Swiss-Prot record:
It catalyses: glycolate + NADP(+) = glyoxylate + NADPH + H(+); (R)-glycerate + NAD(+) = 3-hydroxypyruvate + NADH + H(+); (R)-glycerate + NADP(+) = 3-hydroxypyruvate + NADPH + H(+). Its EC number is 1.1.1.79, 1.1.1.81. InterPro entries: D-isomer_DH_NAD-bd, GhrA_Enterobacterales, NAD(P)-bd_dom_sf. This is Glyoxylate/hydroxypyruvate reductase A. Belongs to the D-isomer specific 2-hydroxyacid dehydrogenase family. GhrA subfamily. Keywords: Cytoplasm, NAD, NADP, Oxidoreductase.
Length: 312
């Protein structure tokens, strides 16, 4: 079995060594420009078109939860990866736990009004504030994939009303489900904290815009853990400046690294991290990929295959 590997920042020798340990008999090599030798599987992140084009592969694995970089290239180069070759993404591999930690910590930060107390501290003011009630602090999650389900699960013990919005109806315990465009408005009108975990598709690009934000209750919060392209940053800033939004926590941006001239840097009610909410953990990802390849080789069912029409 021949496997080609391409990632510009991962420790490639480590990945090759560990994959070969978990897949006895496999030969894993780093792909470099000009390598046209046969391969059975490709493990990639933002691959050049020539890496995949014309290859008779059994499957391609994206080394992350998102596959938008591959799908965007396919629009211009449809022969890069024929539909007959399945495309897989990392379903969890430790990312679910990281998203849980991030989401719970930020929701609690806002619920306990630590943002307000930090502002008072900077103003040298000693002022106890009224508490928020958990049963009135509704958290709405946009996106009902593996990560959205994990985040909802982690928030349940805290007593917040939970709701989810997705393409199709979900039956999650203790979570109110809204589905499709027809129910988006109702979902938003009752949401105090909006958590975005949507996939990056043509339908979701720019979804967090002026129209959407206007439907949230006054003094709501936005937590973006998905993709920067989901947020129209000018509309987000306008909502913050008008008081419609009380705060925003952003892990992803339309341009990364975030340009120095971006007004997001200096805004007092914007907090941010540099796209680190959930990173690929090598050993968990390697084990998932090795197990999935082994199941494919045995002809057994697997999960994680991307529906290219939907984009996730």
């Amino acid at each position: 079995m021949e496997i080609i590997f391409y990632h510009q920042t991962f420790d490639t020798p480590f990945w090759i060594r560990e994959l070969e340990k978990q897949l006895p008999g496999a030969r894993v090599r780093e792909w470099k420009a000009g390598d046209n030798q046969p391969a059975d599987y490709a493990l990639v992140w933002h691959p050049p078109v020539e890496m995949l084009q014309g290859r008779a592969l059994k499957a391609v694995f994206a080394l992350g939860a998102g596959v938008d970089s591959i799908l965007s290239k396919l629009r211009d180069h449809p022969d890069m990866l024929p539909l007959s070759i399945p495309l897989f993404r990392l379903e969890d591999t430790g990312m679910g736990r990281q998203m849980q930690e991030y989401a719970v910590s930020q929701v609690l930060h806002w619920f306990r009004r630590f943002d307000d107390y930090q502002a008072l501290k900077l103003a040298s003011r000693w002022q106890p504030l009224p508490e928020y009630r958990a049963d009135e602090f509704t958290v709405g999650i946009m996106g009902a994939g593996v990560l959205g389900a994990k985040v909802a699960e982690s928030l349940q013990p805290w007593g917040f009303p939970l709701r989810v919005w997705s393409r199709s109806r979900k039956s999650w315990p203790q979570v109110q489900s809204f589905a499709g465009q027809a129910e988006l408005g109702e979902f938003l009108q009752g949401t105090r904290v909006l958590i975005n975990l949507l996939p990056n598709t043509a339908e979701t690009a720019g979804i967090i815009n002026q129209t959407l934000l206007a439907q949230l209750p006054d003094e709501s919060y936005v937590l973006n853990l998905a993709r920067g392209v989901h947020v129209v940053e000018e509309d987000l800033l306008a909502a913050l400046n008008s008081g419609k939004l009380k705060g925003a926590m952003l892990d992803v941006f339309s341009r990364e690294p975030l340009p120095q001239e971006s007004p997001l840097w200096a805004h007092p009610r914007v907090a941010m991290t540099p796209h680190v909410a959930a990173v690929t953990r090598p050993m968990e990802a390697i084990t998932y990929i090795a197990e999935t390849i082994s199941r494919l080789e045995r002809g057994e069912p697997v999960s994680g295959q991307v529906d290219r029409q939907r984009g996730y």
